[in-house]
Amino acid sequence: MANMSRLNELVSEFGLVERRLGDPQALADGREYARLTRRHRELLPLVTLVREREQAEADLSGARELLQDPDMRDPDMKELAQLEVGGLQARLAEIEAELEVLLLPTDPDDGKDVILELRAGAGGAEAGLFVMDLLRMYERYAAGLNLKLNVLDAAESDLGGASKVVAEVTGDFAFRALKWERGVHRVQRVPATESQGRIHTSTATVAVLPEAEPGEVNLDLSEVRIDVFRSQGAGGQGVNTTDSAVRAVYRAGTPDEIMVICQDGRSQIKNREKALQVLTARLAERERAAREAQERQERASQVGSGDRSEKIRTYNYPQNRVTDHRLEGEDKNHPLDAVMAGGLAPVVSALARAQREEQLLAMSQEGAEDQHGAA
């Protein structure tokens, strides 16, 4: 049965969030209002289910009273009441299962905007072309979810590929939509430059960095070197005539060095702001990775799917098939043409479902162990 105390806490939080959303001070603070709106959307499905359960329990109680009423002798009415009891009991069991899923641990980063980094791996020019194919796939996927993808920097090649692309993805639950993409992506196809029709295998890596919360990372600007230069990318007249592009280098010349380039727009100020935003996200990711490494060491086990060293997905062009190696059975393979057109939703849904099933299994095992220990 769902944890009642936890449910009550979340319902109370929902009420508090609704009251805060009506507070003029919250409306005046754009960041706080966005946070409250996001939390309201997160809690609404759970609160809706809790209210439905309360109504179903009240209806069930009324139907049972009707069945037990000695003055009720109409057999048709009694049969209807029995059917209602059965239907309500079945629905309450469904609600209970749905609430258990909604109470599973959630990723606190799910509602955040994202820095998306694509890098060519093994395969030379073909890997760079694959990077651009992935970028177009993510652009279409994002558009379908009403997310905005904006390229901040791209190291493009003459053949139409890119060794690196850095983009910002903003909108509701951007991280939740893209977090499953972290890792090594492999492509198998005949490159455009291949004259003998041989299939080549190339790779690209994808990093998905959630935006850093204010105060999450203490970025000391005295440790950041800012360089400005003329943009090297496309953008029409004026792009290359002013020093609008910005390079931010954290702890230059040290093992901790991080370099970020932003040449998205013509405004040096905006490019500087975006570069520091990406730099902060990378620092936050580095700190998270360090914490995870420490946790892995302490429990002497590997953190599964999502490790960047894993090949998470293979794109097989000759067979028009995308295989996600984290999935099993019917969920494992998907039509390549649909996926490359932005149809990632079935893959993402399957991954989220598999994670929920693993969490539910872990919870049931913990519960069984607790009962065994109590016995």
Swiss-Prot record:
Entry-linked InterPro entries: PCRF, Pep_chain_release_fac_I, Pep_chain_release_fac_I_sf, Prokaryotic/Mito_RF, RF-1
Pfam families referenced in this protein's UniProt entry, alphabetically: PCRF (PF03462), RF-1 (PF00472)
Keywords: Cytoplasm, Methylation, Protein biosynthesis
Highest taxon listed in the record's lineage: Bacteria
GO cellular component, one term: cytoplasm
Molecular function terms from GO: translation release factor activity, codon specific
Membership in a protein family: Belongs to the prokaryotic/mitochondrial release factor family.
Protein name (database record): Peptide chain release factor 1
Phylogenetic lineage: Bacteria, Thermotogati, Deinococcota, Deinococci, Deinococcales
HAMAP family: Rel_fac_1 (MF_00093)
Positions of region (Disordered): 289-326
Main location class: cytoplasm
Locations listed in the record: Cytoplasm
Organism: Deinococcus radiodurans (strain ATCC 13939 / DSM 20539 / JCM 16871 / CCUG 27074 / LMG 4051 / NBRC 15346 / NCIMB 9279 / VKM B-1422 / R1)
Post-translational modification: Methylated by PrmC. Methylation increases the termination efficiency of RF1.
Basic and acidic residues: bias regions: 289-299
SUPFAM superfamilies the record matches: Release factor
Name of the gene this protein is made from: prfA
Function statement: Peptide chain release factor 1 directs the termination of translation in response to the peptide chain termination codons UAG and UAA.
Keyword Flavoprotein part of the UniProt annotation: no
Residue list for modification N5-methylglutamine: Q237
